[in-house]
Amino acid sequence: MNVKMRAPHNEAYAYVNRTILSLTILTLLTGCGTFGSNSNQRTPGVIIDDTVLENLVENEIRKSDPGYKGSHLVIVSYNGLVLLAGQVASEELRQKANTVTQGLRRVRKVHNELTVGGPTSIMARTNDAWLTSKVKSRLIANKEVKGTRIKVQTENGTVFLLGLVSRAQADKAVEVASNVYGLQKIVKVFEYTD
């Protein structure tokens, strides 16, 4: 006798997944109206485009030369402005990464902060993650800075600040970030609204 048992937990998971998907879509659609009403913020579509662009840039750079195999590349895009950070083996690879990135369709501007040298250690990357979280939390906590509009990336002790902000907001963000112990330098990669 062939008896099929139904797994009730599978139906429950399917229901939960559908509910989560529905809520996510609803949140995104609601957010479209919120983001679209202020030209100083990125829309959800631009945020997705930036994420896709980051992956595309890294893939194209790595495909362009086998010398990138041991490189540590950090690619960050904010509104089509692309930050290249990390370490590569030679100045030639540093310049090539810049050229490859500039040749991509949705890239508006490239900030090449790649350094020539070996990749950073796990300990250095852990410290970078800690610095990023400290800077980001201070920016969000500061009432004078619109911290949610500023993206923070740290590489080898250098904090990069990206965003769509006024010059006053940029200066305040640098002031707030400079009070975090352990960072070596701050680089502004902002697009200014004024």
Question: Positions of the model-derived regions?
Answer:
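N-terminal targeting leaders
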Residues: N2-D194
